[in-house]
Swiss-Prot record:
Involved in ribosome biogenesis. Required for processing and efficient intra-nuclear transport of pre-60S ribosomal subunits. Interacts with the AAA-ATPase Midasin, which is essential for the ATP-dependent dissociation of a group of nonribosomal factors from the pre-60S particle. The gene is rsa4. WD repeats lie at residues 132-172, 175-214, 218-264, 267-307, 344-383, 387-426, 429-468, 471-502. Signal peptide: none annotated. This is Ribosome assembly protein 4. The keyword Nucleus applies. GO terms for biological process: ribosomal large subunit assembly. Keywords: Nucleus, Repeat, Ribosome biogenesis, WD repeat. GO terms for cellular component: nucleolus; nucleus. Associates with the pre-60S ribosomal particle. Interacts (via WD repeats) with uL18 (rpl501/rpl502). Interacts (via UBL domain) with mdn1 (via VWFA/MIDAS domain). Interacts (via WD repeats) with nsa2. The lineage of its organism: Eukaryota, Fungi, Dikarya, Ascomycota, Taphrinomycotina. Residues 28-116 are annotated as: Ubiquitin-like (UBL) domain. Belongs to the NLE1/RSA4 family.
């Protein structure tokens, strides 16, 4: 009797229609290609190239044409076809010809974009171990303007401000009466906010570490998340609006300068886990209640509720997050002459980022999955991303918005396409839960922190570990890569702040 095969599942049917591996023919006709800069600043003459050329081969050819061969620049390539931009993922054949998008006799105009106009060197060694905290370090963040200033929050009820150049503490910021759960620099680096399990938010001078004004006390349970208003949206008086998320199920919007509560955003039915303030003046909040809410920052009204997760949502990341965090500061060593000058530069950077990749949102959950959203266009997911075997603790868009890195309790880091959500790679090397990951400013490198006491630096292009960084004596909860690319900071249960450099 013949064996009857079970019917294909929906997933198997989908995979059969979209095979993950496509055989690329060794011989394929030459095609007519013209390279054009994505900003229309340069257009090269047409030439013939093999229709099965890989992205790396196109990159090498373009560098040769642009006379960059001595110091080659990595590029992304895209094809504009019928009012749609198709990114060249691996090679021309799979992206353009295999699916019949175009024919070999067609003329192809390939838009090229440098992945970054400067390069960040991988951190390779611990250059400082700074002691002072008497409790577990659970949060760490570099100043948006310089890698010489770092703030950390700890279970010893204090935050500390560090000088990373001299490897010494500047100040111990005392005032909280419970764990400091989150820290946040204003995007112009003019003020530091700290949130605590004592239900309060405090503010500090970033030069001396001295307190600024009284604590904000309207939350009734611990503060879990802080996020400043983006610099390009700030009024002439300065960047003084802050969003806070709490275990009391609310998000609150504050005028920090006046010490007034502007709005209480009520609607979540369980504790808030993460808050993001987008560049379109929308506020995004995630919660134990399995939902993400979108709020209008102008009036505090709930605009949308994003549903799709089956368990609590742990973390959110925006594709524009890097430029929102760093404001006007970039690789050009920009020195603003005034606040309006600073705000103008921040707006230019944001609009350039928005033009390149839009403003998408990714959410990470206890249900082992991620969801990619385009909230400005729809409340329905772009896609759901499966693969992690345990809780997904953290998600982070690369600065260029093209890639998403996720950290999970399954001991792995995964990479996903930032536009489609397509799975790209699993980065294995950690032997225990991975807590956080942080990108280099040029989007080429990634660092992850783990329960296994190590940091690991990954090369995103090769999808392999570049450096293993042991040194901590206990699990590492917090990691940050400075916006200028010079340093990585980490902290954890061994109470030490470690600085890593190249």
């Amino acid at each position: 009797m013949a064996t009857l095969l079970p019917p294909k599942s929906k997933r198997q049917k989908k995979e059969s229609l979209n095979p993950t591996t496509i055989e690329i023919p060794e011989k394929f006709p030459l095609v007519n290609v013209q390279f054009r800069a994505s900003d229309d600043s340069n257009e090269l003459a047409s030439l013939l190239v093999p229709g099965n050329s890989s992205v790396r081969q196109l990159e090498a050819l373009l560098n040769q044409l642009l006379e960059n061969s001595d110091d080659p620049v990595p590029y992304n390539f895209a094809l504009h076809h019928e009012d749609e931009t198709i990114e060249i993922q691996d090679n021309l054949y799979t992206s353009v010809f295999h699916n019949g998008l175009m024919k070999t006799e067609d003329h192809l105009t390939l838009l090229y974009t440098p992945q970054a106009v400067f390069r960040v060197r991988a951190v390779t060694r611990c250059t400082a171990s700074m002691n002072g905290h008497d409790g577990t370090i659970i949060s760490a963040q570099f100043s948006p303007s310089t890698s010489s200033r770092l703030v950390t929050g700890s279970g010893d009820f204090t935050a500390r401000l560090w000088d990373c150049d001299t490897q010494t503490p500047i100040a111990t910021m005392k005032g909280h009466t419970n764990w400091v759960s989150c820290v946040a620099w204003a995007p112009d680096a003019s003020i530091i906010a700290t949130g605590s399990m004592d239900n309060t938010i405090r503010f500090w001078d970033p030069k001396k570490g001295s307190p600024i004004g009284d604590a904000l006390r309207r939350h009734t349970k611990p503060i879990m998340a802080l996020c400043w208003q983006p610099l390009h949206l700030a009024p002439d008086s300065g960047p003084y609006l802050l969003a806070s998320g709490s275990k009391d199920n609310t998000v609150r919007i504050w005028n920090v300068k006046l010490r007034t509560l502007l709005f209480t955003l009520s609607g979540h039915t369980a504790p808030i886990t993460c808050v993001r303030w987008g560049g379109q003046n929308w506020i995004y909040s995630s919660s134990y209640d399995k939902t993400i809410r979108i709020w209008d920052a102008k009036d505090g009204k709930c605009l949308h509720i994003l549903k799709g997760h089956a368990a609590r949502v742990n973390h959110l990341s925006l594709s524009t997050e890097h430029v929102l965090r760093s404001g006007a500061y970039d690789h050009t060593d920009f020195k603003p002459k005034s606040f309006s000058d600073e705000r103008r530069k921040a707006k230019e950077r944001y609009e350039a980022c928005l033009k390149q990749s839009g403003e998408r949102l990714v959410s990470a959950s206890d249900d082992l999955q991620l969801i990619l959203w385009d909230p400005q266009k729809s409340t329905k997911p772009i896609t759901k991303m499966h693969g992690h075997q345990k809780v997904v603790n953290h998600a982070s868009f690369s600065p260029d918005g093209r890639c998403i890195a996720t950290a999970s309790f399954d001991s792995s880091v995964r990479l996903w396409d930032g536009k489609t959500g397509k799975f790209l790679a699993t980065l294995r090397g950690h032997v225990a839960a991975v807590y956080q990951c942080a990108w280099s400013t040029d989007s080429r490198l990634l660092v992850s922190s783990s329960q296994d006491t190590t940091l690991k630096v990954w090369d995103v292009r090769s999808k392999k570990m570049k450096f293993d960084l042991p040194g901590h004596e206990d699990q590492v909860f917090a990691v940050d890569w400075s916006p200028d690319g010079q340093r990585v900071a980490s902290g954890g249960a061994d109470k030490a702040v470690r600085i890593w450099s190249h």
